[in-house]
Amino acid sequence: MRIRIALFAAAFLAALALRVGVLLSVTTNYDLESFSTAVEILRRHGALYLETSRYNYSPVWAHVLLGLDTAAWRADSTLAQTLGGFLLLFDAATALLLARLAGGGRRGAAVALVFFANPVSIFVSSFHLQFDGVALFFLLVALWCAERPEPERGGTVAALSASLLVKHVTAFFPPLFVRTRRRREGLPWLAAAVPYAVFAASFLPYARQWTGIRAHVLGYRSLAEDYGTAMLLQIPGAPSWLPTAVFLASIAAALVLLRGVALRRACLLLSLVTLLTVPGIAEYYFVWPIALGALSGGAGYLVYTLAVTAFFLGSPDGLNLPLTHLPGWHGVWWSLLLWFALEVRRLEREGRAAPA
């Protein structure tokens, strides 16, 4: 027992050292420059959504950045290091929460380690300094509140609202928490709408900047890469709206089909569908299913992790190593499709094994 505990502790410390080492190697990147621009605009009380097209989120995150920048100045540090430390704390909290969701004990420690040592999570939080993991942490909090023996509906709604306020990558998840025949303790539809109302209300102080909000937040489509549904535009005569239409139709179908699926599995499958069909992509999006996937593991999770890690090694926005035959955008997409197919097959097997 002591040896096992020592091994787990050593593994967590090694993962922590790797995260800190990667963080200390980063001085700036494109997104950090965008964050700095948002901070500078807020400091002089400028028009956040009109003066730059590079801030695409709710105002809440901009004010978090302002606070982190102030803390960095007082500590004689940099925004990169302060932001990285902030993200590291949330990843550590995510690992602890995953351990609780996994039931604690040996399995809980293993699930926490699978996430905390995952190269994809390390790359996104410590190298890219992206904050998707913060939004996903609050999604996990909502899941934890919903799955308690006596579900905490208020906590679920608050956590879903916080997740959307941080980054609206979880915009399609609240309907999964609605009451169904299988999830009788789920949220009423009105309660599930609260996170959207909170997200919309966060923009009220910036109502005069509506044109910028519409263009840079609601109209933001990320990067156009040769990935997933964007390849539909290679079809001669394909309309420009086709990838978005396929994406929205896929999300709608998933929300309907997943109503009878256990909540944590439904959340994972929705994250996979979202990432498979999203019409615009950035490489840090690949962290979206990592925390949820750690709860179930499996061959699909492993293959996807390896594919994304190899992609980061060769990506110009990653380590840009001069190695040939590393997977590109298509390789990651196919690994994601494999993971999705394996999860669907697992779900079907569990359904057949369930008592009638």
Where does each model-flagged region fall?
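Transmembrane-embedded, aromatic-rich helix segments that form part
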Residues: 156-164, 169-180, 285-288
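Generic hydrophobic alpha-helical scaffold/packing signal
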Residues: 163, 198, 273-274, 289-293, ...
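Hydrophobic/aromatic-rich transmembrane helices and adjacent perimembrane loops
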Residues: 138, 172, 282-310
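Hydrophobic residues within alpha-helical transmembrane segments
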Residues: 82-85, 114, 158-162, 166, ...
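Primarily membrane-embedded glycan-assembly and transfer machineries that use lipid-linked glycans
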Residues: 2-148, 180-273, 278, 282-283, ...
